């Protein structure tokens, strides 16, 4: 997914500015990867109604904010995730631009796997955990990841009488 081109606050932009930023990001994705992303994680999690309804992207935020950008402390990031409770179906916000976050990730990935978690893309999470297809102009945010009840597996659904 995209995180925008200029890392500007998309929620404070009008539609023309949002589209210009998205077009610049799309051009770069197309040049480097040969495709454009279907997902957008807006910087700061900031969005407005215009972005939600006209971006043509699925907008994804997070359900656990490590605040790695604030502390820049690997140990605090690790402890925060380890103490966050049940992480099943959660999206953990991390910023790879900080060395401390990279160091925290080197600890967290093995720990998460040892705890039995499976690491998947956001699209896979939405489909596998919640049974939804990723839809353009839909927002997947804290409430979606924290409070959406996953569907029961087919074998546990009672048969109709």
Please provide the spans of the model-predicted regions.
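Structural recognition of the beta-strand scaffold that forms the well-ordered cores
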Residues: 1-4, 38-42, 58-63, 90-94, ...
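A mature extracytoplasmic/lumenal domain signature
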Residues: 4-6, 14, 44, 96-98, ...
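Alpha-helical scaffold elements lining the catalytic groove of polysaccharide deacetylases
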Residues: 8-35, 46-88, 101-104
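A short, structure-level motif marking secondary-structure boundaries and short turns
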Residues: 10-11, 92-94, 150
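Surface-exposed helix-capping loop/turn segments at secondary-structure junctions
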Residues: 31-37, 116-119
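Proline-centered helix-kink/hinge sites
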Residues: 37, 42-43, 106, 110
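Periplasmic/luminal catalytic loop of GT-C fold multi-pass membrane glycosyltransferases
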Residues: 88-95, 101, 112
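C-terminal domain-boundary segment and adjacent tail
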Residues: 100-161
């Amino acid at each position: 997914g995209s995180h925008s081109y200029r890392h500007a606050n998309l929620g404070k932009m009008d539609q023309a500015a949002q589209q210009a930023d998205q077009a610049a990001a799309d051009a770069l994705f197309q040049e480097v990867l040969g495709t454009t992303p279907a997902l957008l994680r807006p910087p700061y999690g900031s969005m407005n109604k215009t972005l939600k309804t006209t971006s043509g992207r699925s907008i994804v935020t997070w359900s656990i904010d490590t605040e790695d950008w604030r502390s820049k402390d690997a140990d605090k990031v690790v402890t925060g995730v380890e103490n966050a409770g049940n992480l099943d179906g959660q999206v953990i916000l991390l910023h790879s631009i900080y060395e401390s976050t990279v160091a925290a990730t080197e600890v967290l990935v093995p720990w998460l796997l040892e705890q039995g978690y499976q690491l998947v893309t956001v699209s896979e999470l939405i489909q596998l955990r919640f049974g939804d297809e990723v839809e353009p102009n839909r927002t997947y945010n804290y409430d979606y990841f924290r409070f959406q009840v996953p569907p029961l597996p087919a074998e546990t659904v009672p048969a109709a009488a």
